[in-house]
């Protein structure tokens, strides 16, 4: 198990380094020159299917809807989204790999695909089994509490309260051991000398509802995914897992400022196609998804989800 954890951390660190690589380009700048591209042999002649390995209410569901809208607006090609949550993405990945590799099926996935393979080499290897169309979101994580919480109001008081609960405190998180969220929470609890129960939710909406309804004491999530709760004043962040304070969260301390000496792992989300899809169809799909990233509708979506803090585009 220790070897698996080491392999998994190495994989996540590599992926994070790739996703966070510095870019001289401006976030949101369009880097696809071609405004149009001829369809190869008439492809696609019908709607595409996008398999989304998570529920519609979470970050993956939101970005899948936004990208599908942008691709359709650009090309006129409809995209049917097929949500298959479960196993932190493994259910959807299995379904996708069993679908025809004809270019009509595309996949939304996140960094969990890399960690799943790192933990179990029999799982699909994203670097070998998939072709990336576009990475369209790169973001950091935070820990949230209810805005009207009175037992603690900031990170130091939260840590003090958790330590006094003798392991009974709870935080809502994703369900899969070995995911980026679970790895970071282990780093945080070890560094802060906390024992906290991680309550598992594979879908975003129940996870957010658990904090809103008081079933858990805190929430681990990315800011864009809970934007509506932040805007409504329901949630507030008390810790940012990033090396510096983003301007939009300038009043929230980072894990580094709270004495934690680990490199933050970032969440990334993107779109893929099977490696065996016809090459000319892959080229068209790459153009369609990368150019769709430039569409006003998608840029407005990313801006609304704090995805302009880090340059989110990777081809």
Whereabouts are the PLM-identified features?
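Short coil/turn segments
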Residues: 55-57, 111-112, 146-152, 174-179, ...
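Surface-exposed aromatic
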Residues: 303-315
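A ligand-binding cleft/hinge motif common to bilobed small-molecule-binding domains
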Residues: 111-122, 186-191, 217-252, 297-299
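Hinge/capping helix and adjacent helix->loop/strand transition within the periplasmic-binding protein
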Residues: 36-38, 73, 95-104, 117-206, ...
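N-terminal (or domain-start) structured segment
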Residues: 28-129, 168, 177, 190-220, ...
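Short, low-complexity disordered leader/linker segments with a strong preference
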Residues: 1-45
């Amino acid at each position: 198990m220790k070897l698996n954890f080491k392999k998994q951390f190495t994989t996540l660190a590599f992926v994070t380094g790739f996703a966070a690589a510095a870019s001289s380009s401006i976030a949101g700048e369009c880097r696809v020159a071609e405004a149009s591209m001829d369809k190869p042999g008439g492809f696609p002649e019908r709607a595409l299917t996008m398999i989304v390995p998570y529920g519609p209410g979470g970050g993956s569901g939101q970005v899948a809807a936004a990208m599908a809208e942008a691709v359709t607006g650009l090309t006129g090609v409809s995209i049917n989204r097929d949500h298959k949550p479960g196993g932190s993405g493994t259910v959807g990945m299995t379904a996708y790999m069993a679908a025809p590799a004809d270019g009509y099926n595309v996949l939304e996935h996140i960094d969990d695909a890399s960690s799943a393979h790192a933990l179990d080499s029999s799982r699909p290897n994203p670097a070998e089994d998939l072709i990336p169309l576009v990475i369209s979101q790169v973001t950091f994580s935070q820990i949230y509490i209810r805005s009207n919480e009175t037992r603690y109001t900031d990170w130091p008081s939260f840590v003090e309260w958790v330590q006094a609960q003798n392991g009974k405190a709870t935080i809502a998180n994703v369900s899969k051991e070995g995911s980026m969220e679970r790895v970071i929470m282990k780093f945080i609890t070890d560094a802060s000398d906390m024992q906290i129960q991680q309550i598992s939710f594979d879908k975003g909406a129940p996870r957010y509802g658990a904090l809103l309804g008081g079933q858990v004491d805190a929430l681990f999530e990315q800011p864009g995914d809970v934007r509506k709760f932040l805007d409504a004043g329901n949630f507030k962040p008390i810790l940012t897992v990033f090396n510096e304070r983003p301007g939009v969260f300038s009043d929230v301390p980072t894990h580094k400022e709270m004495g934690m000496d680990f490199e933050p792992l970032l969440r990334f989300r993107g779109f893929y196609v099977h490696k065996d899809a016809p090459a000319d169809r892959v080229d068209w799909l790459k153009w369609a998804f990368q150019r769709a990233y430039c569409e006003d509708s998608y840029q407005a979506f990313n801006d609304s989800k704090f995805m302009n803090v880090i340059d989110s585009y990777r081809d």
